[in-house]
């Protein structure tokens, strides 16, 4: 099989790669391969059963068109201070420009026009003052809340846009390997159900996301492709009554707080705060389960949940952050300890 451009993974990176090619007037044949399902057929059985069913071969919350974004809290963080090391790679001004551009696309596809955390300046000032008094930094981060259910509608509209503009999307297709010739990628090897075949392309984009990070790391090692370990965030998800977080919820919707507590002074931050939200389980490879938070526009609980994360960066000789995180996640001793800390 031949195409001009093949994209591995239909998460946000893969989706926006295809979309940007279209918006720039590309006439090339684009093939988007995704091992999960289309957005309209992705269903988590927990809604009916009330408990996680450990779906195989993959979790429908993490895998499928739009990745985990379709079932997450549905928030866009509109600040270059949030979201990784991209400002260090391409510059803060460029990142801010790209954030505004990406945000405009979400608005085109139906995102809520309201932005949280920017209207009550005096109240924000008071929250920042209280944060400073406790040794924390409050990050200025406007939030556009799509809502878990609205995010699915938006990604469905994007899926249909890609299809109507000629992008071929194949679901249930797992990329098992790259095809290299003279150190140049000329295609990918694909498994689709019981069938296996090769796709040859002029350009190959690998956008495997968090779900495919371990696979991509091993793929790079197998072919001698230069790559660097990223930051690993390990922590707990805490759930409290809405009344405790009422001021922060009403003023900011989500507070982005950073601290460097003693004795180790590692970076610790809050992440993914969900007022009136719901804690959810996500399953990855090797029987690793993690927790996330969902936040609907209309459906609300009596609790607020958020993650508290400690960031780790790894260098030689130990540069296997994914394996490190998996070992921590699988350790019963660590799990028991973390759960006891969460309950305090």
Task: Tell where the protein language model's regions lie, with residue ranges.
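Residues forming the flavin
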Residues: 1-83, 122-336, 343
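Dinucleotide-binding Rossmann-like beta1-alpha1 core, especially the glycine-rich loop
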Residues: 64-117
């Amino acid at each position: 099989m031949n195409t001009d451009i093949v994209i591995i993974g239909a998460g946000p990176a893969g989706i926006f790669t295809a979309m940007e090619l279209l918006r720039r007037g590309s006439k090339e044949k684009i093939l988007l391969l995704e091992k999960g399902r289309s957005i309209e057929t992705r269903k988590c059985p927990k809604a009916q059963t009330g408990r996680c069913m450990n779906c195989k071969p993959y979790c429908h919350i993490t895998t499928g068109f739009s990745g985990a974004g379709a079932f997450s809290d549905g928030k866009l963080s509109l600040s270059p201070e949030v979201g990784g090391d991209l400002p260090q790679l391409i510059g803060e001004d460029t990142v801010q420009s790209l954030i505004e551009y990406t945000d405009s696309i979400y608005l085109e596809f139906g995102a809520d026009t309201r932005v949280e955390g920017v209207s009550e300046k005096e109240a924000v000032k008071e929250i920042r003052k209280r944060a400073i008094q406790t040794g924390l930094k409050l990050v200025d981060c406007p939030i556009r809340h799509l809502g878990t259910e609205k995010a699915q509608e938006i990604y469905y509209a994007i899926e249909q846009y890609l299809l109507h503009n000629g992008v071929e999307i194949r679901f249930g297709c797992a990329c098992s390997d790259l095809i290299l010739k003279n150190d140049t990628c000329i295609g990918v090897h694909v498994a689709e159900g019981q069938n296996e075949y090769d796709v040859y392309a002029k350009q190959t984009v690998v956008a495997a996301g968090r779900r495919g990070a371990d696979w991509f790391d091993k793929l790079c090692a197998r072919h001698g492709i230069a790559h660097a370990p990223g930051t690993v965030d390990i922590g707990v998800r805490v759930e409290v009554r809405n009344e405790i977080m009422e001021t922060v919820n009403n003023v900011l919707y989500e507070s982005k707080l950073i601290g460097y507590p003693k004795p180790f002074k590692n970076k610790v931050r809050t992440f993914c705060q969900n007022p009136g939200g719901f804690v959810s389980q996500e399953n990855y490879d090797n029987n690793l389960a993690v927790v996330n938070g969902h936040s609907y526009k209309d459906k609300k609980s009596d609790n607020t949940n958020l993650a508290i994360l400690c960031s780790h960066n790894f260098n030689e000789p130990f540069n296997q952050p994914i394996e490190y995180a998996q070992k921590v996640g699988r350790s019963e001793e660590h799990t028991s300890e973390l759960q006891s800390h969460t309950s305090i």
